[in-house]
Amino acid sequence: MPGRQTVIARDSRYLDLATTLLQRMRLTSAAGGVWEAADVQWWSRAARSTDRDGQVFWLDEAGEPAAAVIVTDFGDTTQLDVLVGPAADADADDAWALALNRAEALRRRGAAIELPLPADSTAGARILTGAGYQPTGEDVIASWLDAARTPQVTTLAAGYRLHNRADTHDRSHPLVPRNGAGVAARLARCSLYRPELDLWVESPDGEVAGYGLFWPDPVTRVGLVEPMRTEDQHQRRGIARHILTSGLARLAAAGCTRLKVSSDIGLYLGAGFKPAIAAAIYAPPA
């Protein structure tokens, strides 16, 4: 059996390792950490400048991911996530040291660095403040809902129709305008993506009025909502509420017991989600 090792992973290997690590972390802590496995799969919907460098993982003696530093270029900001799984204390210091080094290198190239620090990471807070990092005042919100409390599916406005990607795969994906022509293929390679839970609403004139993507994780039984959008000309007609309640019902039917969204806007609070601060955003010294 090999000893512990460090690897650089890209593409499908990266997604597989990140998914396994985040699932292990969620199974260890029901409300700890920041992200779900589905989050990193959603982030892979488009090519990013940080893809070419790969992502660093520490593997345990069994070859399973124990810790990682994930760097994601979101355009305006570059986000660094330090993921430390259960029983990975031996790798934590190395992960934090690498994260700080990569952040400094990216900052020198002009990147605006953000580092979400989990609310339960006292060691991380000590390391970041010791390196001169400070909270920006912005937080990552995690809003949770027990699947048993899923609200009733609302009625869709007259003339509008709800579809899913499985039934409309011959049509351009609703996410193409904001995420590029390759988004459907990129989503299809994600292990947690389900086309029947990729919902969109068609307007009376045949256009996309809104959409929502719902991610069931059969390992953690957490269902993630990401993204949700109603186009401007179709606002205030109950479209988002219908997509949300339809998607939540389908997540529950898929076996999810807890539902999550990284937002605390009224749409989600009205559906029963309870928000909490999952992480504070830290930035490096100027």
PLM regions and their residue ranges:
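Flexible, substrate/cofactor-facing loop regions flanked by secondary structure
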Residues: 38-40, 149-223
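Conserved donor-binding loop and adjoining core beta-sheet/short helix segment
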Residues: 10-12, 23-107, 204, 209-232
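A structural microfeature
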Residues: 67, 136-139, 209-210, 277
